[in-house]
Curated annotation (Swiss-Prot):
The keyword Transmembrane helix applies. Plasma membrane osmosensor that activates the high osmolarity glycerol (HOG) MAPK signaling pathway in response to high osmolarity. It comes from the Eukaryota. Its main location: membrane. Residues 265-326 form the SH3 domain. Forms homooligomers. The chain crosses the membrane at residues 31-51, 59-79, 89-109, 117-137. InterPro entries: SH3-like_dom_sf, SH3_domain, Sho1_SH3. This is High osmolarity signaling protein SHO1. The gene is SHO1. Residues 52-58, 110-116 are extracellular. GO terms for molecular function: MAP-kinase scaffold activity; osmosensor activity. Belongs to the SHO1 family. Keywords: Cell membrane, Membrane, SH3 domain, Stress response, Transmembrane, Transmembrane helix.
Amino acid sequence: MTLRATKARQQRVSPHIGHTFSFGNLVGDPFAISTLSISTIAWLITLGGGIATKKMPHFSWWGIAFQFVMMVCFVVIYLWDLVDYYRGFLAAGVGVAFVYSTNSCSQLIYQEEPQQAAGSAGFMMLSIVNMIWMFYFGADNAAPANRWIDSFSIRGIRASQVESSLALARSQKAVASPQPAATAFYGGLEGHSQKYVSSTALNGFENTDPHTSTAFALGPEGPTQRNLDTHGTSTYVTDTTNGNTETTMGDTLGLYSDMGDELVNFPYTAKALYAYEADASDAYEISFQQGEILRVGDIEGRWWKAKKANGETGIIPSNYVELVDDPAAL
């Protein structure tokens, strides 16, 4: 089992993402470790040139100090795996550092002293790294360049909130207007209204044993089922001891097996970026091959409901697939 699969499964089991200190978060990302190494070397060259220079501009000294602060923040954020939470801060910070480094480079590059020339070379290297960081942290994880860069990381491609939001906004149109490939794949759409299950239904995954699932328990031990019919549709809600409406994994899969048309329950088309082998101890995961086309639904969380061409349903890690806007082009 790959590290990405193990980490994704741990995130599914726990409703809250835990962030632990690990050098692997930094070392396992070639982009982060390479750019940080170059910036560290450039910063040391700049610092050495500034110390040896008799007349170093005060503005340049502040630029050197600010660059050091941003590099420390970069390391801390990566070690605690908080990049997605502080992308805006990093983009803004390296933008300010880019202004300092470029201005200092322009002031020192025309000086005759070799020490100042060394300082200008260091500032030039820092400017290049800062520009690369601005493009990376200023873009969403779904950006083509970011996806290509993250594909070399051990943790794989990062989840994109923007991509999920855009897909959700198109869901109504996708359900109302069946596409040719989807129609041929599943036999067409018959005009059902969309039934949407929020990703909050994924909470409570501690019950991973299919034999103890209470989705359709008929015995006296199973929780009481309520059938809510507000708009002519049937939705099953499991009563819990604390009175909330969260369901177990068996309940949510039961929803998809009994609620009718597949295109309503799985309105999106996804293409597998990598092959994935389901955990044999988890009956709700499904395996798929690289390049395989799947129908998916409830794309808010890190684990999505999915259905394969052979009718097999289950859950898949979202960072192993990408949504396809035009299934007819596949």
